[in-house]
Each structure stands twice: as C-alpha cells, then as structure tokens.
Amino acid sequence: MVDTKTPGDKKLSVPSKTLSLKPRVETGTVRQSFSHGRSKQVVVEKRGKRRIGDGPEPHAPEVTAKPAPAAPAPSRPAPPPAPPRNAGSGVVLRTLTEDERSARASALADAKLREVEERRQAEEEAQRRAVREAAERAEREAAEARRKAEDERHRHEDEAKRKAETEAKKRFGEGEQPASAARPATAAPAAPAPRPGAPAARPGTTTTRPGTTTARPATTTAQRPGAPAGRGPAVAAEPDEDEAPRQIRRGPGGAARPAPPPKTTHKPGPQKERGRLTVVTALNADEVRERSIASFRRRTQRLKGHASNEPKEKLIREVIIPEAITIQELANRMAERAVDVIRMLMKQGAMHKITDVIDADTAQLIAEELGHTVKRVAASDVEEGLFDQVDDSTDTETRSPVVTVMGHVDHGKTSLLDALRHANVVSGEAGGITQHIGAYQVVSPESGKKITFIDTPGHAAFTAMRARGAKVTDIVVLVVAADDGVMPQTVEAINHAKAARVPIIVAINKIDKPDAKPERVRTELLQHEVQVESFGGDVVDVEVSAKNKTNLDKLLEMIALQADILDLKTNSERPAEGTVIEAKLDRGRGPVATVLVQRGTLRVGDIIVAGAEMGRVRALISDQGETVQEAGPSVPVEVLGFNGPPEAGDRLAVVENEARARQVTSYRAHQKRENAAASISGMRGSLEQMMSQLKTAGRKEFPLIIKADVQGSLEAILGSLEKLGTDEVAARILHAGVGGISESDVTLAEGFNAAIIGFSVRANKEAAAAAKRNGIEIRYYNIIYDLVDDVKKAMSGLLAPTLRETMLGNAAILEIFNISKVGKVAGCRVTDGTVERGANVRLIRDNVVVHEGKLSTLKRFKDEVKEVQSGQECGMAFENYHDMRAGDVIECYRVETIQRSL
C-alpha cells in the first residue's frame, strides 16, 4: 500500500528483541485416596496467566493494596510498537481510496460509540456492586455481632461451670485445683495476620506489576518441602476454619473485597496441614481458602450441644381421652414419644404395639403419670343437654294433665272416651276393638280446662303400647266393667301404673247393666293392693256408664282435682321435649309420628331428633285434624318431616342445628348396630348355647314379610308371632316395616319363598302385579287375632305328624310250610285279637323283635281273607322275609297318623 503521509519506499524489519515463550506451567503431585484403602498419585499442573511486557516476572501472588475503584471500560489492546523504518528503500504503498477512508472512519466512530456504551455499563455495574457490597457488609457485621454475643455467653457458661466444679471439689475434700490445671490454658489472642484484601501491604515486600496498582506481599513462611516452585505463598498465621470469614472475589484480575480483621482469638493450626497440596487447592490456587461444609456442620453440632445442655421446661397439656384410644394417638395428644408410653405399659406388665387400643382408665393413668391433666369424654356426650334440663321456678306455668285410659278388653275404654269427646271412635275400629294408641284433648265443662286423654288397647298383644301410655301419663284411669270384674289385663294395667308411680282413678263402667256388681269390683281390687276411698284407701273410684253418659262430669271433676293435687307445671318457652306415642309411614305424607309434647313448645321449622331419626318439622296436625303452627305442653300432635319413621316410645327433642342432630342420630344408629351385633354374637358364646343351637338346627322356619300401618301394631304382631315358635317350627321374619307393600318386598319374598302379610295396608299396583306374576301370596288383615290364627295354622302344617300304634292281635307260629312260588308260609293260630292283611307285623323270638314288616299273604283254608279272628288258624307270609321258626310270635298292629297343631 502507499501511505499518503509518509511517501517513499518502506521496508519490513524485525524488532531488535526476539520474542520468546517461557513455560508458565507449574507442576506438582498429590496422592488421591479412594475407597477400600486404595490411593493414586496425581500430577497437578498450575497454569498461570500469560502476560506480555518488558517488566520483570512477579515472584509473589498479587494482593490488592486497597479496594479497587470501578473497573475502567475495556478497550482493545494497544498494537505492539512498530519497528524502525528504513527510509529510502522498500516497497512503495499506494494511497488509500475514498471508500477505504470512509470505512475506516465509520469503524472508528463505531468503536468510540461502543467505548462510551461499555463505559456506561461499567459504571452501572460498579454502582450495583457497591450497593451489594454495602448490604453484604451490613449482614456480615450483624453476623459478627451475633457471634460475639454467642461467644460471650459460652464464656460465661464455661466460667460458671468451672466455678461449680471447683466448689464441688472443695465440698468433697479433693482440694482446690487451679483452673489452669483443670482446663488447658487458652492461647492468647494473636495479632491478626495480613490477609488478602487488607487495606495496606507490608512495606518492602511487594512487587509491582507494570500497569497495575495491585501489590503482592512476600511471605515469610517457608514453603512445604516438595512443593512446586512459583506457587502462591501460604499465610503465616491463618485463622481457624471455623472462624474465618468468607472472602468473595469478583473474578480473575479483579480486586478482592476488603473484610474487617477478626477480633476473636485464633487457634493457629499446624503449618503442614495448611500448606498441603490437594486437588481443590491446586485448581483454586488463586482464591483464598473458604469455610468448608464440615466446619459449618461442626459448628452447628456444637451449638446444638450447648442447647441440649440447657434444662427444658416440661409442658403440661390437657389431654382429651375418649372411651378407647390407640397408643399412637395418645402419645400424639400428649406430645410424647410412643416408645415412652409403651415402656410405661411394659412396667405395668402389659405388652402392646403402637396400634393397639387401650381403655380410657389405662390412658388416664399414663397421662397423669407423665404430668398431664386429663379430660375424659365419651361418645354419649353428644346427648348431654337434650333432656331433663332443670327449669327456673319463676318461668313455669300450669299445664294440662295427661290421662291414660287402661283396662281389660271390652270393658268400655274407647266408649267412655267417645262419651267424653262426643265422638264415635269405636265404629271406626276394625272388629270394634282398639288396636292403636290414640291421644285426644277434652275440655272440662266445669272448669274449662283441657285434659289430654290417651287411649290404649286392652288386648294382651298390646302390652308394649300400654307400657308406653303409662310412662308418659300423669294419671291412670282404670276402667273395670261392673259385670265382669277384675281380669288379667286389668291386673297388668295396675302393674304398669305402679311401675310408672302415677295415681290411679278407678272408673267402674257398665253400671246400667242388670247384673252389675260394683262392690264386687272394689273387693277384687283389694287383692291387687288397690284400696278405694270407700274402703278406707286413697284411690278415687267413680261409677260411670258410657252408654247412658252417667257421672261423666264427676269423673272429669275427679281428674281435675287430682291434677291440682299434683301441681303440674312446666316452662313453655324452652325448646320442646316429648315422646313418640305412635309412628307410621303414610304414602302421601311420608313418615308421620304422633307426639305428646311434655315440655316447651314445638313449632313448625324446628329441627327435631327422635331415636335414630331426625328431621325438620314441616307440619303439625292436631287431634281434630287441623293444621297448627305450634304445640305447647301436654298437647298431642302429628308431626310431619322426619327422614324415616321413628320407633314408638322414642323421646323427641328439639336441637339447635342440623349438625348436632346428625351427631346424635349417628351415635344412636351406631349403638343400635352394636347392640344387634352383640345379641347375635352372644348367642354363640357358651357351651349350653351351642348345644341348644345344635338342637334347633333341624327346626323348620316359616318365612314371613310383615308390613303394618303403624309402629305399635307392628310391634304387637311381632311379639305375638314370636310366642308361637317352638323347638320344631318358628316364624322367621325376613322384613318388618311400616307402610304399604312395595315391589322390593315382593322381590325379597320371591328369593326366600316367603308369604307377605299386610296389616291395615295394601300393595301398590306394581307390587300386586309382580306378586301375581311370580306366584307370591299376599294376605291382608285388619284384626290382629285373625292374623295370628292364620299364621298359627300355617306353621302347624310344617310340624311332623304324630304316629300312633294301635294293637290288633297276636298269633303263634305252629309250623313252617314251603310253598312253591310263594316261599315259606307260617301256619299260625291267632291267640289274641284279630290279624288283618296288609297290617304291620313284628316277629318276636325269645321276647326279642327280630323283624318288622308287613303281611304279604293271609290265608285260611287256601283262601285269601282280609282278617282272622282270635282262636282261628291261618297261614301268613311276610314281605321279603322268610326266616320264620316254629314257636315265634307274630304281633299285628296298625299305625295311625295324627296331624299336630301349635
């Protein structure tokens, strides 16, 4: 090329000093250890950074003398100096063109722009680094302050422990020993050694690299023998690795960040250990040694050790213990280890696992022994507060009495109530007998007060109904017919009233009949400890006639007087409580329960619980069939809204919300299942029960499905059928429920070949069609005694008939004849009675029965005859038996089959 500025010939020349490459690699060997005791020599090379320049080679590692300012913007390295040109000779270069000049100008402008941008980025990076370093410095100072406080606390603890040991030795006569002998003296704090990044380097020991301001202090410590030459020197007094702060380097050639010198005592380690060459130190030779993970782990363990030596405060907890709890759950509630609980049980002689269930008493002993307080709870706690809450006497008011009418069958209980209510309930009852329990309200014409009457059945099958009526009543009116006297159900009603501890008013009915004898009734009542007032007792008696409505007002007056004596009061503003008198499943209205409210007021919308059923009151219907919004104390109502029909006799209560209702019903359902399972498992317990099961294993069963209109009638039917069972045959109730006969009942009956019985209910159209299609028998009844009689007859048909033997006569064998085509024929003489052809016979030899069978041939003078009278001779042959001898006796008898009945 031609240079326009220096025209002339130019020649290329070589610089005076020849360029050369010096080896920049330092080598060394280390021994690398492997598992199982193996080791290997490894050659390690340290490659230094190549630096080009005329300055002398540095002999010490570079150390920054002070914190480096912001790094200048990087620029392109300067070209090497041009060699001296020899004027007057060489190749002539051509002049630059305009395109080349413009290209060079644009490249120069771009370079300047890049330089400005790089300088700006460097300044921003320096600012960010300064902010980060300030935050790290503040964090480091805070950590240093915490470490100083921790060291001071440890020093005080060690001093206190040392004093305690000295005092203990003095007390036990071992003599006082100086603290220096008991504990090694702590090395005096040494002056901090110069560290990389210190503000000033040791004078006279630095070597300055050209173009830099970084100094490398020369070390005064000899290198380890065998170390490679040129390796960075080791620090003379390096702090302990547990206490050495971490040094952060920003990169090769960058200045190290200054760190404050440590002010704590340093433990000088062996020079040999610090100068050892390893793979890590060889690869990171230009970095300062950092704190290792093992050092951090040792420090953490040391702090944990100090913390474990401190006495821990025992936490006392309130432990809730149910009726049964596992060991693991008990330990969790006490915040104790399960092994500690098992260890305590082992001391008591019980071996358990953490999954074993222990009772509440054992759990309470363990919790109290560990210092905790115990709160015992039970599953039945969900029923607390439902019933029998004490009312304040200032909030009570007088309520109507509840009167139960009881007595024997056909003594006129329902007729008496009809006369009081001016109604005709008897005509509506099937067969003219009461089979349901009913509740009614009557207004007394004298005082205008209401009286609640409960009518109970008088038949023997309705014992449970009478017992329920006696439990919820205040007064019992015992109806006795004047012409019939005291009967078995009358005695039962007296016992129910005594068990319920309620007063009795005797109503002697049917005094209008000519053969009525009221005095005989009073005398018979004395035999059962019922003493009327006319006989000097305290029991009120009234002679009435339901037919002619005689003395009914006097009976009401006596009831009101007895109620005043009882002083019946209750709080009507509290949540309602009552008793389910009767329950049924209505097809249109769903589950319906007849409830007698005893305390409080039952309102529409209340959430109620009765037995294992719950619900919300949708409607209240009075005894007159009217819909009401609320029912107060002593008021009988029909309640609609249950999820299912409750059982008769269940107590009803109003709860605050559905969650509480679900808790109560789930607990009661669980108890019901447990009781059923216990009754089944209890039947397999003892040896006697097993023998009885073996005895009844051959018992025949009569499968039945029973559907009734109300719960009380169903209960009476089941009780009556249960009494029909014997050791040979029994009624097996596959399903019993309240409501109409459904298609599912027919399906169940088909699977077990059972009969379906409907009491005051009918089958729907689908069920009737399915029963007709599958040949299932459905029987309908309205009177309980007709139902029981038919089932009794059907069960009697399953009984094995009785076989009765009737003796006909005896015959003695005189001689044996062999007849062709017939075999042996015995020539006999009838000694007693008669002998008939086809009758059963026994062959007796020496008073021992040797054969039982039937006569095949009976002849007299070669003629077949039907019978032979006593004193006559005949010939007899047996079926399939010919071993007859002279002198044997033939006994002839007839077997009669007699059908048995329950």
From Swiss-Prot:
Residues 432-436 are annotated as: G2. Belongs to the TRAFAC class translation factor GTPase superfamily. Classic translation factor GTPase family. IF-2 subfamily. Pfam families: EF-G_D2 (PF22042), GTP_EFTU (PF00009), GTP_EFTU_D2 (PF03144), IF-2 (PF11987), IF2_assoc (PF08364), IF2_N (PF04760). Residues 509-512 are annotated as: G4. Residues 545-547 are annotated as: G5. Residues 398-567 form the tr-type G domain. Residues 69-84 have a biased composition (Pro residues). This is Translation initiation factor IF-2. InterPro entries: EF-G-like_DII, EFTu-like_2, IF2_assoc_dom_bac, IF2_II, IF2_N, P-loop_NTPase, Small_GTP-bd, T_Tr_GTP-bd_dom. Residues 455-458 are annotated as: G3. GO terms for cellular component: cytoplasm; cytosol. Keywords: Cytoplasm, GTP-binding, Initiation factor, Nucleotide-binding, Protein biosynthesis. Its main location: cytoplasm. GO terms for biological process: translational initiation.
